[in-house]
């Protein structure tokens, strides 16, 4: 069963069913840059529109084109294979002599801009991502769909980690348990894993650690949604500043905090598990600990702590920016919005209803998405 298939909906029951990604053009993602290029330096900054290929493939292609090692190519984030996406890449060219850029253009990618910059593009160096999603075969009452979209724009949504984090049927979480020394039986019980486990590459290990952490966060967020406190304050709340990773509190509830919460300047937060004490206290901490008290969650917690990860926080609430919609046909709905880095468009769709993804990835431990 998928880690995301039974998540609760904060705004009520589903109001539609639909199909997504019937073609790559139905899922368009534009990276929102975090900085202006310097125009100088030895890193060629390329803005690339790609179709039907993942970010790692394009990075390898650029390295081959430039005649450099793959580590000389930088990008801010991974973009989906089954989509039309626009993002930046940096290519290290110390002599500032670039091969023919036009030679890169083909059916899979086109370079739409190029300039120079004085440093390599680092992961996370983006303001966010803009999405244009086209849903087809939409079934549901139009008034109910539009009312739900308006509610999402006004109140926001739970900041779920999307299915991409967990692999097919949540397989990455099961693989993380094996990495931590456990196997899970069909009845949910845990047993020691065989000692002759295969050695994982660093990227595989990192992906499984992320899956374990994300699963625990979603379980805490599930508890908060079920008690309708995902966008409100509990005693002992640790607060996250909107648009940053800065965390403060707990502190006594006040009119000032209430105003900041209402205008989306701050959000309640949940744990990204690791070693160390929870930042939250009192009621908020009790909810977090209670949501993660089952044997599987305890095994994941212990594994993350042993792996050396430290306690961090993630906002429980997310508000899509500039949410707009238009009906292209009677059963075709186009959505447009922007999200901060690390947030999932599928979390927006989940609040609408059951959306079947025709371009569903195969994200096991070998996934490069």
UniProtKB/Swiss-Prot annotation:
Molecular function terms from GO: RNA binding; tRNA pseudouridine(13) synthase activity
Active-site residue numbers: 80
SUPFAM superfamilies: Pseudouridine synthase
InterPro entries, A to Z: PsdUridine_synth_cat_dom_sf, PsdUridine_synth_TruD, PsdUridine_synth_TruD_CS, PsdUridine_synth_TruD_insert, TruD_catalytic, TruD_insert_sf, TruD_pseudoU_synthase
Entry keywords, A to Z: Isomerase, tRNA processing
EC class name: isomerase
Domain TRUD: 156-318
One cellular component (GO) term of this entry: cytosol
Pfam families: TruD
Ranges in coiled-coil conformation: none
GO terms for biological process, alphabetical: tRNA pseudouridine synthesis
Reaction catalysed by this enzyme: uridine(13) in tRNA = pseudouridine(13) in tRNA
Enzyme Commission designation: 5.4.99.27
Family: Belongs to the pseudouridine synthase TruD family.
Function: Responsible for synthesis of pseudouridine from uracil-13 in transfer RNAs.
NCBIfam families listed in its UniProt record: PRK00984.1-2
Protein name: tRNA pseudouridine synthase D
Naturally occurring in which organism (per UniProt): Xanthomonas oryzae pv. oryzae (strain KACC10331 / KXO85)
Lineage start: Bacteria, Pseudomonadati, Pseudomonadota, Gammaproteobacteria, Lysobacterales
